[in-house]
Structure formats: structure tokens, C-alpha cells
Curated annotation (Swiss-Prot):
HAMAP family: UPF0398 (MF_01575). The lineage of its organism: Bacteria, Bacillati, Bacillota, Bacilli, Bacillales. It comes from the Bacteria. InterPro entries: YspA (IPR010697). This is UPF0398 protein SAB1311c. Belongs to the UPF0398 family. Pfam families: YpsA.
Length: 187
């Protein structure tokens, strides 16, 4: 049974998404919603993120929406270090602040500012040790920052009974095609 899932993946710029109204976001959020609803049917209680722009913050937007129906669903934002949004533009900082207002739990692994890449590695390790499953949206065909976490995830799974759902672009494309077809049929 999966009670806690860590959701991560590409940052928005790694997907060439630079605007909040990009149509790709709608489909990605529908996909994330579909995955979380499947886990809710199996007893999901918590969704964890580290507060990155892209897949992680879109996930929290989905969770906030789902909480209207699933009032027992909670989400936590656990950042690698404090002040990780300080270099973000004002618009993104505002979006993040809104997410934090809705979060059920907020903390940082390191209660200091950025000191080095080891903080990201420790945060990734923390997420693995405090979740039952990872939903990773990452395709090796388009390498980006999640590749480092994926390697850690694979190593962790080799040593434990941890499970993951690594979503590739093929799976995303199939879901989007089905969704577009069903949306076309509803008109």
C-alpha cells in the first residue's frame, strides 16, 4: 500500500515551457491527476515535493484541486535548503508562496541557505526514505536534471523493496492522445 508518494521530474524550462497558459501544462496536470487518483484508490495519504518549478509545483496544483474531493489527501513541501526561491522572478515566487499557503507541511532539510550540491543529494535521499513510492516523470531520451535522482532511485530500489513509477514520453503521449480523443468526442 502506498501511503506517501514523492512526485518529481522535469523543471518547466527543461520541457521548454515558459508560460503558465502553455497547453502542455493542462495535459501534464491531467496525467498527474490520473496517477494520483489511482494511488488514492490504493490508500494514498501524502504527496511530497521539493518545491521545484515544473512537475513538482504542477503536482501541488493538482493536489489542491483533488483535496476538494479527497479531504484526507495532504501534501508537503520539503526543500533542500532555505531560500531556494530567492533567485526566482517575482511571478514564480508569488506562485510558490500560494502553494506554500495551501501546504499541510513545509520544511527544509538544511536550515541554512545554499551551501553546495550535497544538499540536493541529501534531500533526494530524504524523499526516498520517507515515501513508499516515487512518481518520476523522466525520459532518458531527453536527459536533464532528473537523471541524477533517477540513478539514486535505481540504486535505492536495488537495496530495498521500494517501488517507483518512471513515466516516459511514450506513456505521456499515449495518455495525451487518449485524452485529446475523449475531449474531441465530448463536443
Amino acid at each position: 500500500m502506498v501511503k506517501t508518494v514523492y512526485v518529481t521530474g522535469y523543471k518547466s524550462f527543461e520541457l521548454n515551457i515558459f508560460k503558465d497558459d502553455a497547453p502542455e501544462i493542462h495535459y501534464l496536470k491531467q496525467f498527474i491527476k490520473h496517477k494520483i487518483e489511482q494511488l488514492l484508490d490504493e490508500g494514498l495519504e501524502w504527496v511530497l515535493i521539493q518545491g521545484q518549478m515544473g512537475i513538482e509545483l504542477w503536482t501541488t496544483e493538482v493536489v489542491i484541486e483533488l483535496q476538494r474531493t479527497y479531504d484526507s489527501l495532504k501534501f508537503a513541501v520539503i526543500t533542500p535548503f532555505q531560500g531556494h526561491t530567492e533567485k526566482w522572478n517575482e511571478h514564480n515566487q508569488s506562485k510558490y508562496a500560494n502553494i506554500i499557503k495551501h501546504a499541510d507541511y513545509v520544511d527544509s532539510i538544511f536550515h541554512t541557505s545554499y551551501q553546495g550540491p550535497f544538499q540536493f543529494k541529501q534531500a533526494d535521499q530524504f524523499m526516498l526514505e520517507h515515501s513508499d513510492q516515487t512518481l518520476l516523470i523522466y525520459d532518458e531520451e531527453q536527459e536533464a536534471s532528473p537523471k541524477f535522482f533517477k540513478q539514486m532511485l535505481v540504486d535505492f530500489m536495488d537495496k530495498t523493496n521500494y517501488t517507483c513509477d518512471i513515466v516516459t514520453f511514450d506513456e505521456l503521449t499515449a495518455f495525451i492522445n487518449d485524452l485529446q480523443w475523449s475531449e474531441d468526442q465530448s463536443f
